[in-house]
Structure formats: structure tokens, C-alpha cells
Regions:
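Short alpha-helical segments enriched in small residues
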Residues: 1-115
Length: 115
């Protein structure tokens, strides 16, 4: 998990030009975080989450804007969430949504495998 913008590039492999062009909170950054996690860790799946938990907006994105990226054997997806509540509630809902995305992908992949 990387929080600081510079670490998104150095540790997770998010391209610096992407961070400069779109800022740290964008669907493309969430996708790049997920792909970076998968690639750098040699994992089957990678999750990437970026968003604004508050208390203030960031880069023109309102509080509660969250992007959940998932990279897996079948490619990648990014889901936008619009959440409400305080910082802790937004973070908790984000974790639940990210894990639900991962679980759904694992279940779908398991259903495709031969018995």
C-alpha cells in the first residue's frame, strides 16, 4: 500500500507523467496501482485504490470520490465509487468495496477452471 504520490511512482510503478497529468486520484492511477501491485509482487491479482476520504476535496475531486482498480489474469477493471460519511466511514467502505471486487473476480475465475 502506498499513500504518498511519489511512492505511487517509485514503489508501485505508476508512470510519473500520468501522475502529473491526472493527479493521484484518477481511474487511470487506480488501474496503474493495481497493475503495479500485480506485476511487482508476481501476484495473480492486484488491487489499487485511490480517492478522497476528506475532510477536504483534492485536485477538484469531491470528498467520497474513490477509484478501485483490479488487475488479474483476464485484464483490468476500474470502478468509481461515490461514498459519503466521515473519513473513517469512507475508508471502511472503500476497503469493503475493494475486497468485494477481488472476491468476485476470484470466484468468477474459479468457476472457469476445470473441476
Amino acid at each position: 500500500m502506498v499513500y504518498a504520490t511519489d511512492l505511487k511512482a517509485t514503489l508501485a510503478g505508476v508512470p510519473v507523467p500520468l501522475l502529473h497529468a491526472e493527479g493521484p486520484v484518477s481511474p487511470d492511477v487506480a488501474g496503474a496501482l493495481a497493475a503495479g501491485a500485480r506485476d511487482r509482487l508476481g501476484a495473480t491479482y492486484g488491487l489499487g485504490v485511490t480517492g478522497v476520504a476528506g475532510p477536504d476535496s483534492q485536485g477538484g475531486r469531491p470528498v467520497g470520490t474513490v477509484y478501485v482498480g483490479l488487475a488479474g489474469p483476464g485484464g483490468g477493471t476500474v470502478r468509481q465509487l461515490t461514498l459519503s460519511g466521515d473519513r473513517d466511514a469512507i475508508r471502511a467502505a472503500t476497503v469493503e468495496a475493494a475486497l468485494a471486487e477481488l472476491l468476485a473476480a476470484v470466484r468468477a475465475r474459479s468457476a472457469e477452471l476445470p473441476a
